[in-house]
Regions:
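Intrinsically disordered, low-complexity acidic Ser/Thr-rich regulatory segments
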Residues: 1-42, 52
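Forkhead-associated
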Residues: 26, 37, 47-84
Length: 84
C-alpha cells in the first residue's frame, strides 16, 4: 500500500505573530475582525482574498476586492504561493 504525504501546512507570519492552517478549509484574509488573517488597512477589503489548497498547491485567490491583489506591480486574480 502506498501512502501519500500529507498536504503542506500553510504558515503565515504577520506583525510578529504566526498562524498555521491545514489544507481542507479556505482561509480568509482581510480587514474584517472575523477574518482568519486580519490586516487592518483601509486598502484591504473586509474579505480581500482566499487562501486555498487546490490540486497539490496553495493558492491566493482575489475575492472580488475593490483594490485587487497585486504581485510585482501586476494585478493577479490568482497567485501560486511558494515557500520562502
Amino acid at each position: 500500500m502506498v501512502t501519500r504525504p500529507a498536504p503542506p501546512i500553510l504558515t503565515i507570519r504577520h506583525d510578529g505573530s504566526q498562524r498555521s492552517f491545514a489544507a481542507g478549509h479556505e482561509v480568509v484574509v482581510g480587514r474584517h475582525v472575523q477574518a482568519d488573517v486580519r490586516i487592518p488597512d483601509p486598502r484591504i477589503s473586509r474579505a480581500h482574498l482566499i487562501l486555498r489548497f487546490e490540486q497539490g498547491r496553495w493558492l491566493a485567490i482575489d475575492n472580488g476586492s475593490l483594490n485587487g491583489t497585486y504581485l510585482n506591480g501586476y494585478r493577479m486574480p490568482v497567485v501560486d504561493i511558494h515557500d520562502r
